[in-house]
Amino acid sequence: SIRDNKVAYASFKEGKLLKYEVTNDINKYNFKTGTIVSFIPDSKIFKEGIDLDYTALKKQIQELAYLSPGLKFTLKYKDKEEETIQSNNGILDYIKDLNNNKNTLTSVFYTENIEDRIGVKIALQYNDTYIDTYKLYTNSIPNSGGTHLTGFRTALTTSINDYAREKNLLKEKDSNITGEELKEGLTLVLSFIMPDPVFSGQTKDVLSSSEARTIVQRLVSKDLKTWLEGNPKDAKA
């Protein structure tokens, strides 16, 4: 790893640190900052060797690129041609990719906020399908659900209904639009960053930190209201 003209090198074997050193020898590298990670499977555990799934590996790196705009990844695997993966627009590029070849109904709503060391990035867009697509992350780790999603759903449902009532799109006798109805055709990317997150579920991929719901709900409600007011055509869609 290179930073501040210093090279830090660490090697591990069977979970134990073998070597750690910091030097000034940066001339043999073709970059000024960054990290290289290499590994060899432990033959005591993987006795038959391993064969990495290149497609899955590339997909994971592409997601990391979306979550870290501007960061450049280089992927080289066996005899495949070296690839550079980078996203300049972050999750805005992600939404565009997810809705590729779909008929979109709205522009993209995007918000980004940082509060007390907790960060939230959200991009959403509706298409004309009946399928909802959620891509959720906490500290760049994929999640299948959690309190951040709960907070988002509450904010979305409340904001849409408040706007519809205010603009007379829903009459007094009309029932509120439900969260289930708002799921149809929704494409969402939600990146949540916080220190010491808590996870639950069998595979520990569900965020259960209670503060995530409160923060996401408050921030999304505020910015979504502004977006709806400024984009009436999208709001009606």
Language model feature labels by segment:
Residues 43-52, 170, 200, 226-230:
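Short, polar/flexible loop-turn hinges at active-site or ligand-entry regions and domain interfaces
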Residues 178-237:
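Extended, well-ordered alpha-helical scaffold/bundle regions in very large, multi-domain proteins
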Residues 55, 62-65, 70-202:
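GHKL/Histidine-kinase-like ATPase module
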Residues 7, 22, 36-37, 108, ...:
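Extended aliphatic helical segments
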Residues 1-97:
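GHKL-type ATPase core
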Residues 5, 166-170, 230, 234:
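Short, polar/charged, Gly/Pro-enriched helix-capping and turn/loop motifs at alpha-helix termini
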Residues 3, 10-29, 52-60, 135-154, ...:
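Extended active-site and interfacial segments that coordinate phosphate-rich ligands
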